[in-house]
Curated annotation (Swiss-Prot):
GO terms for cellular component: ribonucleoprotein complex; ribosome. Part of the 30S ribosomal subunit. Involved in the binding of tRNA to the ribosomes. Belongs to the universal ribosomal protein uS10 family. One of its GO terms (biological process) is translation. InterPro entries: Ribosomal_uS10, Ribosomal_uS10_CS, Ribosomal_uS10_dom, Ribosomal_uS10_dom_sf. This is Small ribosomal subunit protein uS10. SMART domains: Ribosomal_S10.
Length: 103
């Protein structure tokens, strides 16, 4: 597995959860002897919604909501067999979406 690269992309609404998960992944990969690049912070996506508070009149009365999607990317350059096994057994927070690709 010396020629391969593992790219891990993480998404979460809470930046504390995603930072904690990236720290766990980097610590696990370094402990097993792999070379790690990252975590690389990717642009945060901000979705804003404006909703009328009144069902009939008062067009000026509105509520605004925002949801932020935080993203991070980690490259594991030289993974070993122990690295892959440790990453498969790793238990991350429930609010973090993990995408793993081999390249």
């Amino acid at each position: 597995m010396s020629n391969q690269r593992i790219r891990i992309r993480l998404k979460a609404f809470d930046h504390r959860l995603i930072d904690q998960s990236t720290a766990e992944i980097v610590d696990t990969a370094k402990r097993t002897g792999a070379q790690v690049r990252g975590p690389i912070p990717l642009p945060t996506r901000k979705e804003r919604y404006t909703i009328l508070t009144s069902p009939h009149v008062n067009k000026d009365a509105r509520d605004q909501y925002e949801i932020r999607t935080h993203k991070r990317m980690i490259d594991i350059v030289e993974p070993t067999e122990k690295t892959v096994d440790a990453l498969m057994r790793l238990d991350l927070a429930a609010g973090v979406d993990v995408q793993i690709s081999l390249g």
